[in-house]
């Protein structure tokens, strides 16, 4: 009887120890689960940790030379400005890129500098208006000018006038900039992106018209499969000379602003300091926004109707500084 009792006691001890281990194992598993940390999402459009200075490149957009454009696909942001005679020019922003060919590159206008200031960008151009050159000097702009630089070359497959044939590469301008200027920056990227997909609570926006003048009429059509906007100018596909691909954009911002003539040479002063209205368009929807800019060197801020700064989808952006005397159509 005593032997049987001892055996039963031993069995009970073994069972209790085994159960204890199982409970401890379960407890340890729970604790391990609690300490799991999700990796932060990273943006694809820019490297938020990079300190490299961006480059702001002036791009020719006159109709006869538009077919010679190349390298715009690599730009994170492109701005369109009204210029003299109803034509427009682009300022394309590149960060952490080594694009082999960009162009055609054209001359500076003083308002183009206001965009470069927002990014602390090195300003790349080929020539300039009197007002442009005056401000480059007066405001101590770090620039690379094709008029006195070896970072440019001529290419003319379409037999265009000489002023429409200048190209550069980011490899070349970076090398030149490294010998002249500071090439790192602490300036925060001025546009605000969301790491999660943004779907606007707005009106349908699958067919957009953004004219600048009788001469320059832009439009966008939404590609719902790829969730981007295909760009057209005067009803024609806006296509890269080298890749033959149509330019597409994830985000479109329209900022409506006034302008005035500065002199008899028809140079314009774009009223990009102050405030105004516009639209933000992405993923087939559009909302009304406001824009504001305190001074030429400050960032332009875009807000929704509730006064909250808008967040862009993680992708490239086209910003239209559309004249207030032109009508935007969104369908």
Say what each PLM segment does.
Residues 2-10:
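Sec-dependent signal peptide recognition
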Residues 15-18:
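C-terminal motif of bacterial Sec signal peptides marking the signal peptidase cleavage site
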Residues 26-75, 79, 84-331:
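A surface/extracellular/periplasmic glyco- and lipid-processing/surface-interacting theme
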């Amino acid at each position: 009887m005593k032997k049987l009792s001892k055996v039963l006691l031993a069995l009970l001890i073994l069972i209790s120890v085994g159960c204890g281990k199982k409970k401890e194992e379960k407890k340890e598993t729970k604790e391990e689960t609690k300490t799991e940390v999700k990796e932060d999402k990273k943006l694809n459009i820019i490297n938020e940790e990079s300190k490299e200075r961006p480059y702001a490149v002036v791009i020719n957009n006159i109709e006869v030379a538009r077919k010679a454009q190349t390298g715009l696909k690599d730009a994170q942001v492109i701005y369109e400005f009204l210029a003299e005679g109803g034509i427009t020019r682009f300022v394309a922003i590149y960060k952490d890129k080594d694009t082999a060919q960009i162009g055609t590159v054209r001359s500076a206008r003083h308002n183009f500098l206001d965009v470069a200031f927002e990014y602390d960008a090195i300003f790349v151009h080929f020539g300039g208006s009197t007002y442009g050159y005056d401000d480059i000097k007066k405001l101590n702009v770090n620039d690379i000018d094709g008029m006195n630089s070896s970072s440019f070359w001529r290419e003319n497959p379409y037999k265009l006038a000489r002023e429409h044939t200048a190209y550069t590469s980011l490899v070349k301008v970076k090398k030149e900039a490294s010998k002249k200027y500071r090439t790192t920056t602490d300036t925060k990227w001025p546009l605000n992106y969301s790491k999660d997909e943004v779907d606007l609570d707005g009106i349908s926006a699958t067919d957009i018209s953004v004219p600048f003048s009788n001469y320059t009429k832009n439009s966008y059509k939404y590609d719902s499969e790829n969730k981007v906007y295909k760009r057209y100018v005067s009803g024609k596909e806006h296509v890269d000379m080298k890749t033959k691909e149509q330019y597409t954009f994830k985000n479109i911002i329209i900022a409506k602003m006034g302008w005035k003539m500065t002199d008899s040479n028809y140079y314009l002063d774009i009223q990009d300091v102050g405030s105004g209205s516009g639209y933000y368009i992405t993923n087939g929807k559009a909302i009304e926004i406001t824009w504001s800019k305190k001074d030429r060197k400050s960032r332009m801020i875009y807000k929704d109707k509730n006064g909250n700064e808008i967040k862009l989808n993680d992708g490239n952006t086209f910003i239209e500084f559309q004249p207030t005397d032109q009508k935007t159509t969104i369908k």
